[in-house]
Amino acid sequence: NGILYMQVLQRDTKVSGKGSDDNRSYLLALEPKTGKQLWKTYRPAKARSESLEAFSTPIPYSHDGRDEIVIVGGDCLTGHDPKTGSELWRWGTWNPSRITHWRLVPSPVAGNGVILACGPKRAPVFAIKAGAKGDVSSESKSVAWNSEGSRDGVTSDVSTPLFYRDNFYVLYGEGRDKM
């Protein structure tokens, strides 16, 4: 639709190898031809230190007639209205003990009514049901499935999964697995 969406980790004037607790990330929409800012939405997070950081990319996703931008980072996965940036839903339960060194690399991927998000550092892969509203972190019904307890603990610390021909593919460890 001619709009560029990006996640930005805003740092204060201090620069360090680790994030600091006052970093604020946001999702930004720009008009590509002019660079004009269309909207900016801050993404509050309970994450601390390095766990605030993410190298993920926002993804557009449409399900049951609802368009949204999905992004992961700061120990949470969120869906946003692409026209306004407002947060539609939030899920974040893969780091309940608030480990501080869980920087996230893989981007989410979506298909068949679920949004796949990989936790960092060998944490499980989670499939969150599309169409959520509000904070669904405590709702077990919002999770379609996860890889906890699966053979070899399927996870992806760096590679973004692939949705292809109605299947999700996750590259992990020494091999590959189709979920």
Residue ranges and their predicted role:
Residues 1-179:
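Noncatalytic, solvent-exposed loop/strand surfaces
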